[in-house]
Design a protein with these regions (language model features):
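Functional transmembrane core segments of multi-pass inner-membrane proteins
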Residues: 36, 128-133, 137-258
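Membrane-embedded alpha-helical segments in integral membrane proteins
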Residues: 18-21, 109-126, 175-180
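Acidic/polar hotspots within intrinsically disordered regions
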Residues: 8-10
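N-terminal signal-anchor/start-transfer transmembrane helix
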Residues: 38-48
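Short, strongly hydrophobic alpha-helical membrane anchors
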Residues: 12-29
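Membrane-proximal soluble regions of multi-pass membrane proteins
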Residues: 47-102
Length: 262
């Protein structure tokens, strides 16, 4: 009986240790998920600076954040992502001028995108990847999505896509693909670089061809060159399959939007 009792206690102790271990894993997973969201919101705050200043050829580093109406410098405690806009009810604390909801939208969107990337690549399903690849995938996708957010909102307001997003993406994509070949489902650096190069050429070439055909058919420019460079950057980061999916999805969404506007 004593032996059976000891075995029972050992089994009970092991179950308790497993439950504690799972609780610790869940705690740290939620902790880092919260950090990813907050970090994304902070990156979104910086992207707002870039969205406002890059089209105006202003430095994104200096001067500090200021009100676009009265140029009053914004102190750090009034520059907290999302919360400051809500507390100030979308108005400058100094001149009461309106602050566009776009600032909060960019911060929220970037925070949610960063969280989604973390939840994707920190999940148990991603553990089959090489140990060094898994943590590196997260910042690479964060950088890629930050560039897309920047390019999207600048294009929405000014109908241009900054070269820092397009040309920068085409330059950085192959380098990061060589560093993290798992980005393209590869194991060796040269395989990742090759896949990135194929994706870049596919994205740039396909959209350039579509634009060239459209210009000849309609006798006017049918597509901006910024879109061509952006597709090249997408291919450099995600490969040729992502290029085909992006072209198909954007065409489908464009068709749906056109039908709704008729």
């Amino acid at each position: 009986p004593e032996i059976r009792g000891k075995r029972y206690d050992d089994a009970k102790h092991k179950r308790a240790m497993v439950l504690m271990s799972n609780s610790d894993i869940l705690f740290f997973h939620l902790l880092f998920a919260g950090f990813a969201t907050l970090f994304g919101a902070c990156v979104g705050s910086f992207l707002n600076v870039c969205i406002y200043r890059i089209p105006r050829d202003e430095s994104v580093i200096a001067p500090r954040s200021h009100c676009p109406h009265c140029n009053t410098l914004i102190p750090w405690y009034l520059n907290i992502p999302v919360l400051s806009w809500l507390c100030l009810r979308g108005r400058c604390a100094a001149c009461k001028g309106p602050i566009a909801f776009r600032y909060t939208l960019v911060e929220l969107l970037t925070g949610m995108l960063f969280l989604a990337v973390f939840m994707k690549w920190a999940a148990p399903a991603a553990l089959h990847m090489p140990p060094i690849a898994q943590p590196l995938m997260i910042p690479v996708y964060w950088l890629f999505l930050a560039g897309l957010v920047l390019g999207t909102f600048v294009d929405f307001e000014h109908f241009i896509i900054p070269d820092s997003v397009t040309i920068g993406g085409m330059a950085v994509g192959p380098l990061l693909s060589a560093l993290v070949p798992a980005l393209h489902g590869q194991d060796l650096w040269w395989q990742g670089l090759r896949s990135s190069g194929i994706g870049l050429l596919a994205g740039f070439g396909l959209l350039y061809a579509v634009g060239w055909i459209g210009t000849r058919a309609f006798k006017k420019e049918s597509m901006g060159f910024g879109d061509v460079k952006l597709m090249g950057a997408i291919g450099a980061f995600l490969g040729w399959k992502a290029v085909l999916f992006t072209i198909f999805a954007s065409s489908l969404l464009g068709s749906v939007a056109g039908l709704l506007l008729i």
